[in-house]
Amino acid sequence: MSDPSPKRFETLQLHAGQEPDPATNSRAVPIYATTSYTFNDSAHGARLFGLKEFGNIYSRIMNPTVDVFEKRIAALEGGVAAVAASSGQAAQFMAISALAHAGDNIVSTSNLYGGTYNQFKVLFPRLGITTKFVQGDKAEDIAAAIDDRTKAVYVETIGNPRYNVPDFEVIAKVAHEKGIPLVVDNTFGAGGYFVRPIEHGADIVVHSATKWIGGHGTTIGGVVVDSGKFDWGKNAARFPQFTQPSEGYHGLNFWETFGPIAFAIRVRVEILRDLGSALNPFAAQQLILGLETLSLRAERHASNALALANWLKKNDHVSWVSYVGLEEHSSHEVAKKYLKRGFGGVLSFGVKGEAAVGSQVVDNFKLISNLANVGDSKTLAIHPWSTTHEQLTDQERIDSGVTEDAIRISVGTEHIDDIIADFEQSFAATFKVVRSA
């Protein structure tokens, strides 16, 4: 007899992790605006605090509304469990700090979002964790950088802002041969719609849920997804925090007690508990609403982005276009291997003339908003050199894939003709001034 449970993305985004509320029969996910939860008796409370029984204690650690969001994301990504956070940066921090301690390092591509690059370059070294940045994402270069103190390999699904797509399976093989988990930031993968890195060897996935998952520019959030596939017991020497007695839980062994969900449990009950970067239930409800239309929006984002990229290629004012959906992009063939539902919703381009001309193009948009975000249903533009990557040195910006003339566009779900019309009027206004100068 076939399994009747839903497995398709479009159904999971609406139903995974939730049944109608048993107390009220509410079909929508209720917002549980509570700090804490009553215990049935003192023994029940003791079992919860001792991790001998699952349940709610305090909303800094777990909340029923947040729990639905976590279960839904885990289902969409093909993981066994997820832990939500107050932002993508917090989720990323929790994932890495659960793996690496003072004296350890991680190996990461240099093709990173500016905030990630700064977290790895500035914040983690203050905690004794260093990052070995590899130029690009070639597996052989990553392998060469791994040493006995390496605790993770880190890549982005679609690198921001170079839009490179790593060969996940090859990189995962390299990491696993060394006994190290592969961590993938799948933010640009739109909650697993464009690609599920876990299906290609990733062990841990992180998201800024602020972007396509939320999808409307209203809510900051993040999430860590545990694949449940990494064998912490086999790699006990490198990761004793999962296999040796926990000082904070009277000698509890996470791997022996929780098996495949050991990573997610430790992130929740040690890192999230102590860091305090919890997602609040109101934000979780907004992100759940975003998930319900994710596939519809992502499909439109991708089709609009491809159409805009092709239009820009033919425009006389444009000197170059970078979008992984274009055949000439260096990652296009790899992208076709992994991105089966579209090539994402972000592109960059440069205009002819001095670098300042690019800023004028952004300033002259009327429909398109100039702001620091991606994944909104509205089309967004920004000049990364002077904003998202401004805190990096010139060489670090170039290494990350940012050039002084680059304009990044997060393509929204408006009608493509209206998006193009805004480009046309902006170009007309900009180059009229340039010609008259």
UniProtKB/Swiss-Prot annotation:
GO MF annotations, alphabetized: cysteine synthase activity; O-acetylhomoserine sulfhydrylase activity; pyridoxal phosphate binding
Keywords linked to the UniProt accession: Amino-acid biosynthesis, Cytoplasm, Methionine biosynthesis, Pyridoxal phosphate, Transferase
Entries under SUPFAM superfamilies matching the protein: PLP-dependent transferases (SSF53383)
Pathway-wise, it operates in: Amino-acid biosynthesis; L-methionine biosynthesis via de novo pathway; L-homocysteine from O-acetyl-L-homoserine
Carries keyword Cytoplasm? yes
Q: What is the effect of changing residue 330 to P?
A: In strain: JAM 2006
Recorded consequence of changing residue 231 to E:
In strain: JAM 2006
Q: Name the enzyme group at the top EC level.
A: transferase
The family database entries (Pfam families) matched by this protein are listed as: Cys_Met_Meta_PP
What is an annotated GO biological process for this record, any one? cysteine metabolic process
* Entry similarity comment: Belongs to the trans-sulfuration enzymes family.
Subunit info? Oligomer, probably homohexamer.
Tell me what else is known.
E.nidulans has another enzyme having cysteine synthase (O-acetylserine sulfhydrylase) activity (cysB) that has been shown to be the enzyme of physiological importance in cysteine biosynthesis.
Q: What is this protein called?
A: Homocysteine synthase
According to its UniProt entry, this protein's organism is Emericella nidulans (strain FGSC A4 / ATCC 38163 / CBS 112.46 / NRRL 194 / M139)
The UniProt gene name for this protein comes to cysD
